[in-house]
Every structure is written in C-alpha cells, then in structure tokens.
Amino acid sequence: MTDRTTAYARLIVDGKRICGRAEYQACKRHLDDMADRDFPYIFDVKAAEYHIALANHLTIGEGRTAARLTTRGFQNFIIGSLFGWRRKRSTLRRFREGYIQLARQNGKSFLAGEMCNDYATFAGYQHGRVYCTATKQKQANIVWEEVAKFISSDPDLAELYKVREYDHTIRSLVTNTTIEAIGRDTKSADGFRSILAIVDEYHAHPTDQMYKLMLDGQIAVDNALTLAITTAGFNLNAPCYEQYQFCKKILSGNVRKDSLFIFITEMDEDDDIWEPKNWAKANPLNLWNPDDTLNDEMIARMVEKAIDAREKQGNDLVNFQTKTLNRWVEYTGGGLLDLAAWRACASDETLADMRRRSCYLGIEPAQPPM
C-alpha cells in the first residue's frame, strides 16, 4: 500500500530535499517511532491514506477556474501523521495536540480548513463541535471562511453542509457537528467542549487562555485535537514562543511527549538569512515545484522582498524574518535582536562565579526625540 506520510519522512531524512534541522527531526521522529517495537503506538497506513485522499478530493475555488486540490509531500506528512498514529490494539489516536509553524503563504489556512472538514463529517463523531479560534473574531472568521470556500466550490460537498454566514456557523448534515469561529474577545469564557480546536496564529496570542480553554474542554473527548497553526513572531514573552521552545526540546530528544505532534519549517540558526536557497527551508510550498525542485520564479519574487527589507530595516525587516522566513526575533519597536547571536553569547557561569569581581554598568541617559 502507498504510504505518502512515511515516503516524505524518508525523502527528508535521506537528504533528498533541502530542509531545516527541525523538519529533519520531525521526520526522523516518525521513522524512529515506527521502528521501535516497544513503542505504545502504531502507524496505521490505511487510516493515514484515507484522510490524505479526502484532502485530495477538495476543490480550490479561488482563482480563474476551480481545480481539484493536490496535496504536497509535507502536507501529506502532516495529515497522515495526525490521523495515522494510534494506540496499539485501540482506535484512540496518538496525537491530542499539534504545533505547526510555517511561513506565510504556505497553506496554513488550507490545512486548517481541510482538518475542519475532515473532523466535522468524516471522522465518525456525532453532534460534535469544531472551533476556529484566534485573538480576534475577525481573524477566526478567516479560518472559518476557508472551510466555507471548500464547500461552496464543490456541489457534492455542499450537499453535506448547511452554511450560515450571518453567525459564521457551518453544520454537517451527516453528523450534526458544527464548525464555529470564536475570537479570544468572545463574550463566553468557558464551556468549549470540542473534537477539534484550531488555534490560528498562536504567536499573536498574549496569553495561553484560549489554548488552555480549548485543551481543557477536550479532556473527556476521545480522539480530540487542539492544533496550533502559526508563523513565528517577535514577542518572546508570548505563550507561543514558550511552546515553540518546548517543541524544539521534544524534537531534539531532551523532553518526551508522545501526544504532541510537531512540524516546524525554519532555517537553522547559523544560516545566512540573505541566501535565497536557505529560504526554501522555511517555505515548503511556495518556493517549491510539485516535483520537489525549487521554484526560481517565486525565489526571484522573494529576492525583491528581501532587498526592500534589508534597505528599509525596522518593521519591514521584522516582517520579512518572521512572516517570510518563519524566524523568531526580538523586536520592541526600536531595535531588532538576532536570537542566534544572542544565544551564541550564552555562558555556563552562574552568579556564584561573579562573587568578589568588579562590575561595570553603562547607562545611556539620552531621551528619544518627542
């Protein structure tokens, strides 16, 4: 049987496609877990292929003409992993949380929409709830609208749903499961029991309130999933950055959490951010052709963006690094801190090592212009 999930993992681990260390580690984690006979979970290829096939039956209505969707390798890996891994001798799926970090224009909204459609009608759960969440209602509506576009673009799919635009609710006529858009600014603060919760652009969330609210509401729901889909950001005090660091520890093998799926596409810390080939590590969709060759036209367009960012600095450079390169940076409006350079200054010395040593303090008294 075809196994598109594992095929992509092998493509990456065998070095046949440019990738960053985090993506390599995610794929190797999949292969290592499959090879471990004592691992409490197994990978169900049939289940993975079923859900990948569902995604490829969706229709993209945006553009001049509607066209049947064809998933790329990394999308197969994500979908197949989330639905394929399950506990041995059980139908309970392995992953109850997911963290996916992709650069902008790499199919985040598609992925969220595909997952909503799958869970609402094809996952076998009756009278469930699927939530599309974000910091603001307007942003949550964007994910919801992606599902609505899939439905309106396909007459066969449209027969399975009732769409209410006025309150952003979609109801599956097969399972009576609803898909709703909810912002962090919603008036209700609890009672969110769902089978799937999409936490969109998690980097923009000032607290983990919404994420925890969704996760806690699923505690008694079998095969539920809370899925954060985001780009990198510039607030290192945000819960998303904390989750990102936690995920990196799991990928490196320093921490173990088998129920958390992780897929991060980013450049490595020592990569030159102005080298176009490095950008492909953070952009698994829009810089690649379907045959896994680099898309020279798209790279040329990104070069123009890079030139603008490099010359203008400030917000332009921040947006280029976080949104286009999917790279976390520290930015407070006045200066940009390179995290790789900052971490390179790390030391194993402690405060105890500083005792009885001279200390020098530099202060800049100048005030910024009013």
Report each predicted region and the residues it spans.
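Phosphate/NTP-binding elements of NTP-utilizing enzymes
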Residues: 2-363
